[in-house]
């Protein structure tokens, strides 16, 4: 789970940063990390939420734990934006990285490894982390990609680039018969045949594989010439 350059920077073996931790530190300390901001924007413009579907280790854990695919509720899916906004507001109000103290990803990738390494003790902050992790894991078991759909602020941040990213999910309407095979395959519970540019799409490609008519494909966005 704790991959050196892919997730929580509190992980004992991390060598880079968590964009949400980065955003909080930007607010708390006022130092602008231009390089990392540029990297996040560049990645967002390249693939949008593609990271969530292909590289995120916590997303992989979601897939391993859950076998249920429920239709996403549009209003509920915006909760991750509320969490993103609340995270930034809390960093400003308390001058601290408050979300990191609750983040279930940090629980799994930092708190538990540090206790096993003997660096940290089982104390109140550790138990709080275990509580948020337990709730999140329970949600993952009940709902496919529960964390990615409703809670992940990183997913909310990358989804802002989804419709503008170079990597796009394309629907050939002349081939589509509205059979909803793509919707049955989608772990995010969206309807790719009608919502192929949705902000919740993690571009995992399961809908492409599930469409036996070849109506869904990935393509690179073409730059418009004036």
Regions found by a protein language model. Give the residues of each.
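Non-ligating segments of multi-cofactor redox enzymes
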Residues: 1-193, 199-226
């Amino acid at each position: 789970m704790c991959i050196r350059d892919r997730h929580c920077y509190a992980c004992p073996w991390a060598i880079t940063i968590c964009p949400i931790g980065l955003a909080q530190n930007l607010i708390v300390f006022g130092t602008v990390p231009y390089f990392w901001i540029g990297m996040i924007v560049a990645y967002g413009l390249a693939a949008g939420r593609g990271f969530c579907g292909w590289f995120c280790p916590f997303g992989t854990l979601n897939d391993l734990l859950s076998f249920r695919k429920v239709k996403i509720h549009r209003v509920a899916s915006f909760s991750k934006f509320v969490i993103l906004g609340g995270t930034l507001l809390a960093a400003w109000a308390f001058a601290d990285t408050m979300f990191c103290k609750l983040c279930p990803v940090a629980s799994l990738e930092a708190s538990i490894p540090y206790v096993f390494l003997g660096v940290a003790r089982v104390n109140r902050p550790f138990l709080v982390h275990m509580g948020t992790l337990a709730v999140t894991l329970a949600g993952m078991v009940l709902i496919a990609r529960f964390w990615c759909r409703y809670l992940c602020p990183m997913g909310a941040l990358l989804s802002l680039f989804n419709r503008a990213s170079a990597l796009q999910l394309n629907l050939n309407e002349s081939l589509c018969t509205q059979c909803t095979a793509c919707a049955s395959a989608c772990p995010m519970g969206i309807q790719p045949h009608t919502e192929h540019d949705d902000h919740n799409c993690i571009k995992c490609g399961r809908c492409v594989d599930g469409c036996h008519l070849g109506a869904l494909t990935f393509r690179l966005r073409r730059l418009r010439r004036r």
